[in-house]
């Protein structure tokens, strides 16, 4: 007799809570999101192409996953003037609106990176692996098929006025305002245990204004939002 996914979650919740020592709410989130498993172990295959799609070390997009309505970001909104930077149309439109709003406040917010195909991510992963080794990539880079960039809803942002985004005025503005345009600060330092990715100051994810406002107000990672509001 095979257990359903929900039955499995209920069966291991108490055991996992005892072993790890998390409170019940944190344990439920971790178990529901398969964070009780090792990264890349028995990952869930994802076909969702909406703005709330979850891609991480436990949710696998696969080689064939290509977002709908991929759109190029106009050169003037990219750090290198590159017209090959893409995202879903909905995310690109929101990013442009946000960049224009920042510009009105005298800031120079730009997109550094957007959509990456499975092959692009595979090349990125292998490059970092050869340069820095396995311990580095485990913390900072995900394997091909598990990257948010493949969804077309994630962007890395940059400042046109500073080489270090985290030290820029644009970064401070993003922290305070990105949710208004449907973006969440994806890899917070305080959520590393949940996201399983080290803090990335530049990486923001489009989820829509409704979800972004809730995530900002309740201080939720996308994983926590997904467990609380999407996968009930």
Predicted stretch roles:
Residues 16-232:
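Cell-envelope/glycan interface and biosynthesis
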Residues 1-12:
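Single conserved hydrophobic/aromatic residue that forms the stacking wall/gate
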């Amino acid at each position: 007799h095979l257990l359903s996914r929900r039955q499995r979650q209920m069966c291991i919740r108490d055991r996992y809570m005892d072993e790890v020592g998390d409170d019940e709410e944190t344990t439920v989130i971790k178990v529901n999101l398969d964070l009780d498993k090792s990264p890349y172990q028995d990952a869930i295959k994802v076909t969702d192409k909406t703005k709330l799609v979850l891609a991480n070390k436990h949710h696998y997009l696969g080689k064939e996953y290509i977002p709908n309505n991929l759109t190029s970001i106009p050169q003037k909104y990219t750090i290198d003037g590159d017209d090959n930077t893409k995202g879903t149309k909905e995310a690109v439109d929101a990013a442009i609106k946000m960049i224009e709003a920042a510009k009105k406040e005298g800031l120079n917010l730009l997109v550094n990176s957007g959509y990456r195909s499975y092959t692009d991510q595979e090349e990125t992963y292998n490059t970092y692996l050869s340069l820095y080794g396995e311990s580095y990539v485990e913390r900072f880079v995900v394997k091909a098929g598990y990257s948010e960039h493949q969804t077309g809803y994630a962007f890395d942002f940059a400042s046109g006025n500073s080489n270090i985004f985290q030290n820029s005025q644009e970064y401070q503005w993003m922290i305070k305002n990105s949710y208004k345009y449907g973006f969440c600060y994806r890899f917070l330092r305080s959520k590393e245990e949940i996201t399983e990715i080290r803090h990335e100051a530049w990486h923001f994810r489009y989820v829509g204004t409704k979800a972004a406002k809730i995530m900002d107000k309740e201080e939720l990672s996308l994983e926590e939002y997904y467990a609380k509001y999407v996968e009930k």
